[in-house]
C-alpha cells in the first residue's frame, strides 16, 4: 500500500510540476497567482460546453495541459443551462456557464452569475458584454445550411427552397425554446422573411409552414453533429463552425455543401459567465481568462469559430476554407440586447404555431 501511495504521490507531483512549469511565462498579469489559488480546488465544472461544439475539446486540452486541472462538462443547451442554474441557485454545482448571448443576459438578470471581468474584457465590444462582467461574449457563428449530397440531389439555395416538397423529411434543427441556436434560427428566418424583433411572426410562420409541409425530419434538443457525421441528416440548419468542422475536420469533404441562404442570415454571439457561488471560483476565473486570452481565442479560430476579439485573424490554413466574403455579405445585423428581451415571447409563439402547444 505504501508503494502504491508513493507512486500516486509522485504522479500528482509530476502533474503539479508540469502545470507550474507551463506558466513560467504568463498569458496575462496575475495568471500565476490565480493558478496557485485554483490548483487547490476540486477541478472545474463547465456547463454546456460539449466537446464537439465550437472546438471546446481543443480548449479543454489546452487548459488541462497548461494547468493540470480537470474539466468536467455537460451539454445541456442554452435554455436548459439557465433552468439548471435556477434549480441549483441555493447549492450551485457549476463554476461557469456558456450560452447563446440572450440566455447569458437572462442568467445575469436573474442574479445567477457573478461579476467578473476576464483578461481582454476591455477589447470585447460594449454591446456584447455586461458592463459589470456578469456575462461576456467569447465568439460568434453564422447560421447556414449543411447539405449531405449523398441524400439530397438538388442543393437548396435559400429558405424558400426548403419549402419544396422534394425536401420532405429532410430538415433538422434545434428547439428554440431550449437552445441558443434554435432561437438564432428563429431570428434568422424572421429577418429573411422581412420581419424584425418587434414582429417575429414572419419567421415563426415560416417555420410552422416548413413543419406543416412535412419537410422537418426532426427538431432536436441537443447538437446533431454526430448524427450528421453518420449520414443521418439530409439538410442540417446549424452554424458555419459546425459545417466547416464536419467538412474539413471530420473529413466529409465534397460529400457536403455549405450554403448561406440567399435571403439572408445572421451571426450569433455566444457568451459565458462565472456562476454565482460556484464550488471552484478560482478555477472558474482561470478558465474564463484562458478562453479570452490570445491563446484561447486562437484555439477557437483553429476550429473555424470566429473569436470575439476585434482584429483577430484566422490562421491561413483555416481562412482559405471559408465561403467567399461575398456570401457573408448576406449576414444581417441584430440588436442582441433587444433579442434577449423578446426570447421568452418568441419561444412561446414558436411552441404554439409550430407544435400547436
Please place each PLM-identified region on the residue numbering.
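Extracytoplasmic "Venus flytrap"
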Residues: 23-31, 39-58, 270
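Mature extracytoplasmic/periplasmic domains
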Residues: 265-266, 270-334
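Extracytoplasmic/periplasmic substrate-binding proteins
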Residues: 215-277, 311-321
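Short, low-complexity disordered leader/linker segments with a strong preference
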Residues: 1-41, 357
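Extracytoplasmic ligand-binding site segments that recognize negatively charged/polar headgroups
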Residues: 45-60, 72-86, 90-232, 246
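Short, solvent-exposed beta-strand edge segments and adjacent coil->beta transition regions
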Residues: 41, 140-144, 267-271
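A short alpha-helix/helix-coil micro-patch that ends at or immediately precedes a cysteine
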Residues: 59-67
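Conserved C-terminal helix/tail region of periplasmic/extracytoplasmic solute-binding proteins
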Residues: 25-27, 226, 326-357
Amino acid at each position: 500500500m505504501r508503494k502504491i501511495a508513493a507512486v500516486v504521490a509522485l504522479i500528482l507531483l509530476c502533474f503539479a510540476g508540469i502545470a507550474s512549469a507551463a506558466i513560467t511565462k504568463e498569458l496575462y498579469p496575475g495568471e500565476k497567482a490565480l493558478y496557485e489559488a485554483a490548483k487547490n480546488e476540486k477541478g472545474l465544472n463547465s456547463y454546456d460546453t460539449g466537446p464537439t461544439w465550437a472546438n471546446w475539446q481543443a480548449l479543454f486540452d489546452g487548459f488541462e495541459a497548461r494547468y493540470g486541472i480537470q474539466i468536467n462538462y455537460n451539454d445541456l443547451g442554452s435554455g436548459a443551462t439557465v433552468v439548471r442554474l435556477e434549480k441549483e441557485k441555493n447549492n450551485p454545482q457549476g463554476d461557469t456557464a456558456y450560452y447563446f448571448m440572450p440566455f447569458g443576459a437572462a442568467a445575469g438578470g436573474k442574479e445567477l452569475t457573478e461579476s467578473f471581468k476576464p483578461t481582454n474584457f476591455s477589447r470585447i465590444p460594449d454591446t456584447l458584454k455586461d458592463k459589470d462582467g456578469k456575462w461576456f461574449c467569447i465568439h460568434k457563428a453564422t447560421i447556414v445550411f449543411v447539405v449531405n449530397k449523398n441524400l439530397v440531389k438538388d442543393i437548396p439555395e435559400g429558405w424558400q427552397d426548403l419549402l419544396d416538397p422534394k425536401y420532405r423529411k429532410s430538415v433538422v434543427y434545434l428547439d428554440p425554446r431550449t437552445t441558443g441556436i434554435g432561437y438564432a434560427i428563429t431570428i434568422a428566418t424572421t429577418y429573411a422573411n422581412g420581419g424584425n424583433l418587434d414582429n417575429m411572426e414572419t419567421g415563426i410562420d415560416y417555420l410552422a409552414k416548413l413543419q406543416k409541409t412535412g419537410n422537418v425530419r426532426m427538431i432536436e434538443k441537443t447538437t446533431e453533429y454526430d448524427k450528421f457525421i453518420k449520414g443521418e441528416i439530409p439538410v442540417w440548419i446549424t452554424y458555419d463552425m459546425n459545417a466547416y468542422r464536419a467538412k474539413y475536420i471530420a473529413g466529409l469533404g465534397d460529400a457536403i455543401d455549405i450554403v448561406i441562404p440567399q435571403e439572408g442570415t445572421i451571426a450569433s454571439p455566444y457568451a459565458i459567465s462565472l456562476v454565482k457561488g460556484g464550488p471552484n471560483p478560482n478555477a472558474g476565473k482561470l478558465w474564463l481568462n484562458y478562453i479570452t486570452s490570445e491563446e484561447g481565442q486562437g484555439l477557437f479560430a483553429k476550429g473555424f469559430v470566429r473569436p470575439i476579439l476585434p482584429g483577430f485573424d484566422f490562421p491561413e490554413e483555416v481562412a482559405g476554407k471559408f465561403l467567399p466574403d461575398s456570401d457573408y455579405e448576406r449576414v444581417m445585423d441584430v440588436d442582441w440586447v433587444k433579442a434577449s428581451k423578446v426570447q421568452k415571447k418568441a419561444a412561446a409563439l414558436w411552441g404554439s404555431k409550430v407544435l400547436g402547444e
